[in-house]
UniProtKB/Swiss-Prot annotation:
Regions crossing the membrane: none
Keywords: Cytoplasm, Methyltransferase, rRNA processing, S-adenosyl-L-methionine, Transferase
UniProt organism field: Xanthomonas oryzae pv. oryzae (strain PXO99A)
Family the UniProt entry places it in: Belongs to the class I-like SAM-binding methyltransferase superfamily. RNA methyltransferase RlmE family. RlmM subfamily.
Sequence positions that bind S-adenosyl-L-methionine: 184, 217-220, 236, 256, 272
Lineage: Bacteria, Pseudomonadati, Pseudomonadota, Gammaproteobacteria, Lysobacterales
Record: active site: 301
One Gene Ontology MF term: S-adenosylmethionine-dependent methyltransferase activity
Top-level class of the enzyme under EC nomenclature: transferase
Coiled-coil region: none
Localization (cell): Cytoplasm
Protein name: Ribosomal RNA large subunit methyltransferase M
InterPro entries: RlmM_FDX, RlmM_THUMP-like, RNA_MeTrfase_FtsJ_dom, rRNA_MeTrfase_M, SAM-dependent_MTases_sf
């Protein structure tokens, strides 16, 4: 068995399968997607999995929470001895720097969580005894993933820690603080963690910077920016939570965020408005083209059908109309729903 294992939001398997198929074809690697709706993962079967993984960077994949290279598929595992067949399948492999035992984030996968936890504790010492796992986590070495699809069915896969999600299941465990104005704050928190590298965050999100938040009410995204000590112009006809205004970093303008433009360029423009995705893509492109912002993070609400087609169309429309040299990344975040979050920054 050779291929890529990618986790996704339950119900978005067709979109991830279409994305992997399109991207593999673009780089000239043949393969096919194996999945069923609501599995919470897609297995892209191909002979050149390592080469494909190197060409498809994790941050560039839209619908994939995690990207792994499959090295074995084990079926019919004896529940009384799962360790022996795993050690046999790993014979000849290099030493791994860490072990994550996982399951898909799906209705069928979640009942396997307790098995994953307990089996990980049993497997670690066996791997170390066999010389297959370092004594302590070594992030510079490949990471071993065991993904249980059922009690007797598992996929063994490898991750490059520099090109994969740094969280089990590809899900960042963010806590909604009591003072957050809305749950949407988690979207921007996750976007900053996922779409930007640590070095990019340090360089591009600094105290004293200026931002515009379009469609800001009740202030979730504005609040996230103020916690980074960024000055925010929050544009919305609706009210902001009082404690957001009390930071002293926020100017609230009662206006239509879709048509407002700043008097001076800002470092960041963020937008989480409920609007047709193509209209949003066009308006965001105008902001970039006119030089009203240097960088932007915005959400595109996807239709119920043809979501991959709409995603491609909107991103192509944005890049064509922006008329700038940009680095564009998009993700369906864990805290997103029927939407994707897009980052565009000056190249």
């Amino acid at each position: 068995m050779s291929g890529l294992l990618c986790y996704c939001r339950q119900g978005f398997e067709p979109e991830l399968a279409a994305e992997l198929s399109a991207r593999a074809a673009f780089v000239g690697i043949a393969g096919y997607a194996r999945t069923q709706r609501n599995d919470g993962y897609v297995l892209f079967v191909c002979d050149e999995a390592a080469q494909l993984a190197a060409k498809l960077q994790w941050r560039e994949l839209i619908f994939a929470r995690q990207k792994l290279v499959v090295i074995a598929e084990l079926k019919g595992i004896d529940p009384k001895d799962r360790i022996t067949p795993i050690l046999a399948a790993l014979e000849g492999q290099q030493r791994f720097g860490d072990l994550w035992v996982e399951h898909p984030d799906s209705d069928a996968g979640k009942p396997l969580a307790s098995l994953a936890r307990s089996f990980g504790n049993a497997l670690r010492p066996a791997l170390r005894k066999a010389g297959l796992l370092t004594d302590k986590p070594q992030p510079r070495q490949p990471r071993l993933h065991i993904c249980f699809l059922d009690g007797d069915h598992a996929l063994l896969a490898v991750a490059d820690s520099a090109d994969s999600a740094p969280w089990p299941l590809g899900i960042p465990r963010l806590k909604l603080l009591p003072e957050a104005p809305s749950r949407s704050a988690l979207k921007l928190d996750e976007a900053l963690l996922t779409l930007l590298t640590p070095e990019e965050r340090e360089a591009l999100v600094k105290p004293g910077m200026r931002a515009a938040d379009l469609g800001a009410a009740p202030g979730g995204w504005t609040w996230v920016l103020t916690r980074q000590h960024v000055h925010v112009t929050s544009v919305d006809n609706g009210p902001l939570r009082a404690h957001v205004l009390e930071t002293g970093l926020v100017e609230h303008l009662r206006a239509d965020g879709f048509h407002w433009k700043p008097a001076q360029p800002v470092d960041w423009m963020v937008c989480d408005m409920v609007e047709q995705p193509r209209r949003v893509a066009e308006r965001m492109a105008t902001w970039v083209r006119e030089g009203w912002c240097r960088n932007t993070i915005f959400n595109l609400k996807l239709p119920m059908k043809k979501r991959w087609d709409e995603t491609r169309l909107c991103l192509e429309l944005f890049e064509q109309q922006a008329e700038k040299s940009l680095i564009v990344r998009a993700k369906q975040l864990y805290h997103d729903r029927e939407e994707i979050t897009v980052l565009a920054m000056r190249g």
